[in-house]
Structures are given as C-alpha cells and as structure tokens.
C-alpha cells in the first residue's frame, strides 16, 4: 500500500512538511510506502471550467503545461491521499486549491475515481483560520466518496517560522495518531 501527500506550502521544508513527515513516520511503521510531492515552485493553474474532463472522461485534465495530470496519476496509483497546506487567509494555499478543483472535476467526470481511497487533511497555522482550510480539504474528500480517518484532535499544527511546529507537542501527537489511524483504516479497506 502507498500514501501520496501533496504539500501546498511555498516552503519546501517548512511546518507543513514537518507535519506530513510526522504522519509518514507512523505509516512507515505500519509498512505503508509514502511519497511527498512538493507543489512549491511548480507550475500549477486553476480550473478553466472548460468541461473537457466530462467530454473525454480519460482521467486527465485538458489543461496542459503544469503538474496537475502528474498529480492525478499519483492520486490514482495511491491507496491513500494526504493534502497538506499552510493557512492562507483562513484557507488552503492557491496551489493546493487549484489541485483540489481540477482533480476534483476530473474525478467526478470519471465515476468518482478516488472513491474509497483514504484521505487526510494536514494544516499548518500560525493562529487562526485552520478549521476552514481543514474543511476545504475534507469537502473534496467527502464529495469524492473518500474515507477520512480521524485523530485525537483536528489535524492542525501551530507555528509561524519554519520548524516552530516541532514545539507544538499536541500537534505532532495529533499527526502521529492520524498516521496510525490512517494505516489501520487502509488495512481495513483492503481486507
């Protein structure tokens, strides 16, 4: 089994990546392979509402020239998907939102192709707005008919400067619990 995570942060090794790696630690202990895809510095644009995904139904977005179709392929190949983002004005980063919108339309156009995969949101935040960002990701998972594991708290880590989340003991523990629960859920799905 495999989990792919998409880091929507502009900081490759910032708080969001630290939180994802805390989840990955537990997944790896359970024998689940992991892959982290950094959206930072990659070309990615929003949905153009062209509707071609519904016309062609080929598991691909018609917009070319960026990484979205590569990301969709990785999502299809994985058993679990983590979408991770810092909080930008009480929501996910624009790069992650573009991935959600475009992969979401492609999934709907192709018989909910992410159906019954495990999905988990991971949010880094300085102070406020994390719940809305968390909800944005979970709305994508739920409309895609994915299965979402819980944790001991919302999947949020607190910190401003890169590395600050390492001092949020409860946030790191929440990520570890999420990883253990995601591993358990994925094994149950595949029994």
Regions found by a protein language model. Give the residues of each.
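N-terminal beta1-alpha1-beta2 submodule of the flavodoxin-like/Rossmannoid cofactor-binding fold
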Residues: 1-109, 159-191
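Short, glycine-/small-residue-rich phosphate/pyrophosphate-handling segment
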Residues: 94-95, 109-155, 173
């Amino acid at each position: 089994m495999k989990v792919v995570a998409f880091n929507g942060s502009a900081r490759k090794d910032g708080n969001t990546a630290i939180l994802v790696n805390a989840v990955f630690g537990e997944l790896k202990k359970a024998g689940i392979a992991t892959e982290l895809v950094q959206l930072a510095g990659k070309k990615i644009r929003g949905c153009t509402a062209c509707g071609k995904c519904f016309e062609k139904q080929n598991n691909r977005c018609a917009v070319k020239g960026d990484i979205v179709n590569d990301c969709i392929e990785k999502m299809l190949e994985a058993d679990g998907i983590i979408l991770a983002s810092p909080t930008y004005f009480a929501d996910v980063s624009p790069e992650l939102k573009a991935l959600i919108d475009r992969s979401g339309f492609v999934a709907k156009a192709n018989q909910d192709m992410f159906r019954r995969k495990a999905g988990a949101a991971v949010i880094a935040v300085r102070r406020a707005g994390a719940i809305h960002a968390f909800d944005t990701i979970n709305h994508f998972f739920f409309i895609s008919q994915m299965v979402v594991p819980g944790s001991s708290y919302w999947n949020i880590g607190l910190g401003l400067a890169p590395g600050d989340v390492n001092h949020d003991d409860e946030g790191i523990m929440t990520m570890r619990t999420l990883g253990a629960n995601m591993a358990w859920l994925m094994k149950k799905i595949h029994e």
